[in-house]
Amino acid sequence: AKGEVSPLAMETSGHGALKDNYFLDDGAFLAVKLVIALAQAAHQGKKLDSLIEKLPPLVEEGEYRFKINDDDFKSYGTKVLEEFKKRATDAGYQMPQSYEGIRLSFKGEDVQGWILLRMSLHDPVMPMNIEGARKGDLAKLKEIAKKLTDGFEKLDRSSLE
């Protein structure tokens, strides 16, 4: 988001980039950085996982890939994103700034977590990532996602079922 320092850019696919390397998607650079971190941790009597021990645990998550059955998949996907955003806005869902697609954030008593719907850069696919903060939240978030993506005839949402 605007105004936040982010030295790491990470994709759900596992691709990552570091500010130290001009945010280039460079797996070899990341691997070397991890080996260095491992050596430093070992020197301090720690393991590599000590670097992430303060992160909150991942409780429930899922990735769903919706195939777009349209020759002009980019235009169709753009329409889906626009309508998804409109439906989410109409429902009053929180939408933090996102440069990757449409991200919804849920912090209520009933459900906690997030949903991200985006376009694939190269394929006729719309990946949706969902993360629930507590046990049972994933199922609730999937139901919300189903409602928000209902009615798109050329969007195969069968992976969400």
Q: Where are each of the predicted segments found?
A:
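Phosphate-binding and adjacent anionic-ligand microenvironments
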Residues: 1-161
